[in-house]
């Protein structure tokens, strides 16, 4: 039994990743409408009622806008930190709140570790899934990488990480300067070069796939 990662969608229109381990199925982020999630899961021959839980990285709409409807319509447990739960107006009686660097266990040997990452206006985390000696990570929407993140992702067999823009194209583009500064700042997103530098610090012979 191993961990598998399937990206149901990424980008400003919505993000969600299906993580499977044996009979367990967990989503990282749910930035889609209920109807759209049903459609994307159907491609995997799955229904929302088969999902064991949804982990939310942060409250921005493209990552968490579908959490409340998933909670209400299908009763899927939502796992997030306090700030994210408040921003998404989740039912706290049905929401599992976590603290960074405290493992979230879905089975005896299948867990997720939330690792804090910098992102503007959000209490954002990356997630490291583990099963036995196997580990896989999802890190999105971070303006810079930290040594703490390097420590937890080094040697992961699978890494999903953003590479959001080319610096030259960004600064030569037509965006307002203020927006360019926000995108490239510590609270924005990783550039292609930053992601490359990060990966040079975490990839080992054990790493099998990078998305």
What name fits each language-model region?
Residues 80-133:
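Metallo-beta-lactamase
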Residues 35-80, 157:
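Active-site metal-binding motif and surrounding structural segment of the metallo-beta-lactamase
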Residues 24, 74-77, 204-210:
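A short helix->loop->beta-strand "cap" motif at the edges of active sites that frequently abuts
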Residues 147-211:
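Cap/insert and terminal regions of metallo-dependent hydrolase folds
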Residues 1-44, 124-141, 158:
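Conserved beta-strand hairpin/beta-sheet module of binuclear metal-dependent hydrolase folds
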Residues 138-150:
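Active-site glycine- and acidic-residue-rich loops that bind
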Residues 6-17, 57-67, 72, 85-86, ...:
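Structured catalytic core of nucleotide-sugar glycosyltransferases
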Residues 28-31, 51-59, 79-82, 137-141, ...:
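Active-site neighborhood of phospho(di)ester-bond hydrolases with catalytic His/Asp-centered motifs
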């Amino acid at each position: 039994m191993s961990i598998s990662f399937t990206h149901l969608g990424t980008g400003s229109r919505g993000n969600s990743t299906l993580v499977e381990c044996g009979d367990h199925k967990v989503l990282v982020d749910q930035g889609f409408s209920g109807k759209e999630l049903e459609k994307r899961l159907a491609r995997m021959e799955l229904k929302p009622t088969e999902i064991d839980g949804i982990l939310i990285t942060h409250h921005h709409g493209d990552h968490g806008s579908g959490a409340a409807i998933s909670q209400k319509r299908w009763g899927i447990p939502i796992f997030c930190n306090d700030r994210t739960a408040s921003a998404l107006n989740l039912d706290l009686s049905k929401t599992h709140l976590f603290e960074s660097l405290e493992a979230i266990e879905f089975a005896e040997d299948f867990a997720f570790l939330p690792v804090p990452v910098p992102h503007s206006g959000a209490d954002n985390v990356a997630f490291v899934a583990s099963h036995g000696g196997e580990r896989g990570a999802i890190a999105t929407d971070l303006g810079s990488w930290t040594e703490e993140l390097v420590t937890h992702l080094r040697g992961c067999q699978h890494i999903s990480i953003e590479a959001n823009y080319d610096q030259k194209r960004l600064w030569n583009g037509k965006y307002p300067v203020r927006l360019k500064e926000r995108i490239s700042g510590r609270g924005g997103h990783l550039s292609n070069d930053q992601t490359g530098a990060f990966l040079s610090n975490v990839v080992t012979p054990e790493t099998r796939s990078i998305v």
